[in-house]
């Protein structure tokens, strides 16, 4: 817990109603306290950091001027919402963020009436806010709806679908979009829109035009000279700011203004509250504002573990096991040296996907398409038609956004595209919106796909090489974090397609492990004298091995960190059914529900696919296996 007596104003704020009792002149001091509190809190707990620091003033202004929760705020992505959570009743719990049973890392409707829409993926806020505004209008509710979206999220096509719809509606929706322009997503924002916004925020000429207009106008508002000067200013502003883009889409554009200047923010928002129809306010902010180290390293301080704010992040020393992301990072550089046709695509996840070194060593073969997963996949398809070997490096949860393109543009045409899918399966503290629980199900049903799941780091490297060499679409799906610590070398060796690995020969029951569950399955199998197979391939399955094992075993147990519905285990059932083989089957995997935020270890245990859970499930189905346990385990289990 944090000593709130050091925050005399913030300690009096439990809800936005409390905030609105302060005089407007005190808002700057409140913002300073909120920023300091956030730094202290995230220093203790870890979590998303720099984005929240960048919207302190904006968060204070919005909750001060708008009658939340009657008026509704929709935050895009949600990385920036810790200040919002602090002001809306969760101040004393914010130190539990991302922890099991603690505060959710993103807005979550079940957690608070002030969290009006659940988010986690980018670029959804304008569509959701427009839907709310339309529903309110139809219900006769005179409420205001505000969407807060970053410039990084503005690179996604969904944003322009929503803007296009909102700007052409009759009657006009009561909608305000706030463009939080900090030139960043998680990595640096890229693309043509980013360049245009950058010209707006950094134009000395535009600032000079503004100041000149003020001097000419003085206190005059409506005389002919004033009207002429305003038209002249708007004409020149159109050359430097994106107002034309948004106004042609039907939005009234205001800005850009300094997002850290509370009086300017409050003044602009008060004016916008009096206007009808779709409005867009463009604010310029600095990610990490107020904490010098975060301002200087906005990527490194995007999300942090616990740290001492007086010292900043301290680099870890000593040897450490490579993560699966590290394995991919090394492999892709090695493969690029051996395969000149290799090209790599990422949707704005250079750091997260392990592509920093590749982007520097092979800048002409590296394509960051911004937050545009649909484009990323079809871009890869186009490259493949010309003989290139594209690799799409993407998180499992974000591949969901490019699924139609994977099916329609890649798989139907049987194009040579490799999907390097990070954060597959149980991810952990970021919760349901970032889980990779569905990918084996939605990949294995696609014709022509080869789907692989490595049991260790060395196998991951071999599978990536296999996917590049395969003629057709392939996916390697690997988990967050480290593996068991398998020895690695610089080899680019491949695996035979659809061949499993027998890990342990036993009797009675065969445990069929997929991906990250293999080690736990092997430990239990050796305890109980059972056969253990590292399946390696979710599609195609090793049909010959499975049919042979079916002749000599009394039952199969499939184990995967994917939802059971439609997953790898379902593939085994389908294979046996096609061969008219009837035998006891037990499918262990993730439940038919969205997992909450907690550590990866906690979630695996809850799902019953850690070592203890697998053992318990086996003994429940086949109690006679109890006699195979060592005495100590037998007593503990009994």
UniProtKB/Swiss-Prot annotation:
Under the heading HAMAP family, the entry gives:
DXP_synth
Instruction: Check the record and name the SUPFAM superfamilies matching this protein.
Output: Thiamin diphosphate-binding fold (THDP-binding), TK C-terminal domain-like
- Record keywords, A-Z: Isoprene biosynthesis, Magnesium, Metal-binding, Thiamine biosynthesis, Thiamine pyrophosphate, Transferase
Whether Cell membrane counts among this entry's keywords is no
What cofactors are annotated for this protein? Mg(2+); thiamine diphosphate
Q: What is its EC number?
A: 2.2.1.7
The identity of this protein, by name, is 1-deoxy-D-xylulose-5-phosphate synthase
């Amino acid at each position: 817990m944090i000593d709130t007596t050091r925050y005399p104003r913030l300690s009096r704020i439990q809800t936005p109603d409390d905030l609105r009792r302060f005089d407007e002149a005190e808002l700057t001091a409140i913002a300073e306290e909120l920023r300091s509190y956030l730094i202290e809190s995230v220093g203790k707990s870890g979590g998303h950091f720099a984005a929240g620091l960048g919207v302190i003033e904006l968060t204070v202004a919005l909750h001060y001027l708008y009658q939340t929760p009657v008026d509704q705020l929709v935050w895009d992505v949600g990385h920036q919402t810790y200040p919002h959570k602090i002001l809306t009743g969760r101040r004393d719990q914010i130190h539990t963020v991302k922890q099991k049973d603690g505060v959710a890392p993103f807005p979550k409707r079940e957690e608070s009436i002030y969290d009006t829409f659940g988010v986690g993926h980018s670029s959804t806020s304008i569509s959701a806010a427009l839907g709310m505004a339309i529903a309110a209008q139809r219900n006769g509710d005179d409420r205001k709806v505000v969407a807060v979206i970053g410039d990084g999220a503005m690179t996604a096509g969904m944003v322009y679908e929503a803007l296009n719809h909102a700007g052409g509606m009759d009657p006009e929706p009561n909608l305000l979009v706030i463009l939080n322009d900090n030139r960043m997503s998680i990595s640096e924002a890229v693309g043509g829109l980013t360049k245009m916004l950058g010209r707006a925020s950094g134009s000395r000429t535009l600032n000079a035009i503004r100041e000149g207009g003020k001097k000419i106008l003085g206190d005059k508002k409506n005389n002919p000279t004033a009207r002429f000067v305003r038209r002249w200013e708007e004409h020149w502003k159109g050359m430097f700011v994106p107002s034309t883009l948004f106004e042609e889409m039907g939005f009234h554009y205001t800005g850009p203004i300094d997002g850290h200047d509370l009086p300017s923010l409050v003044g602009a928002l008060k004016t916008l509250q009096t206007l009808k129809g779709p409005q867009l306010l463009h604010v310029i902010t600095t990610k990490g504002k107020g904490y010098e180290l975060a301002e200087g390293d906005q990527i490194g301080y995007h999300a942090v573990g616990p740290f001492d704010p007086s010292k900043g992040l301290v680099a870890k020393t000593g040897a450490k096991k490579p993560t699966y992301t590290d394995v991919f990072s090394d492999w892709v550089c090695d493969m690029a040296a051996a395969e000149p046709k290799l090209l790599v695509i990422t949707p704005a996840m250079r750091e997260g996907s392990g592509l920093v070194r590749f982007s520097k060593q092979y800048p002409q073969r590296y394509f960051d398409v911004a937050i545009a997963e649909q484009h990323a996949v079809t871009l890869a398809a186009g490259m493949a038609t010309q003989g290139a070997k594209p690799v799409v490096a993407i998180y499992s949860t974000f591949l969901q956004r490019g699924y139609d393109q994977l099916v329609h543009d890649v798989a139907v045409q049987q194009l040579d595209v490799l999907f390097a899918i990070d954060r597959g399966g149980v991810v952990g503290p970021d919760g349901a919106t970032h889980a990779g629980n569905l990918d084996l199900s939605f990949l294995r049903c696609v014709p022509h796909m080869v789907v692989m799941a490595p049991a260790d780091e060395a196998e991951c490297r071999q599978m990536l090489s296999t996917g590049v060499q395969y003629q057709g679409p392939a996916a390697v799906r690997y988990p967050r974090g480290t593996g068991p610590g398998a020895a690695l070398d610089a080899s680019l060796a491949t695996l035979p397609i659809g061949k499993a690995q027998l890990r342990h020969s036993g009797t009675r029951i065969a445990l069929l492990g997929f991906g990250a569950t293999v080690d736990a399955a092997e430990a239990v199998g050796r305890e109980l004298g059972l056969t253990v197979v590292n399946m390696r391939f979710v599609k195609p399955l090793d049909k010959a091995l499975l049919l042979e094992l079916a002749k000599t075993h009394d039952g199969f147990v499939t184990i995967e960190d994917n939802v059971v519905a439609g997953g790898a285990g379902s593939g085994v059932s389908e294979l046996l059914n096609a061969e008219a083989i009837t035998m006891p089957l037990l499918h262990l995997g993730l439940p038919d529900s969205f997992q909450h935020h907690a550590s990866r270890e906690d979630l695996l245990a809850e799902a019953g696919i850690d070592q203890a859970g697998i053992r318990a499930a086996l003994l429940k189905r086949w109690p006679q296996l109890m006699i195979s346990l060592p005495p100590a385990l037998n007593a503990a289990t009994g």
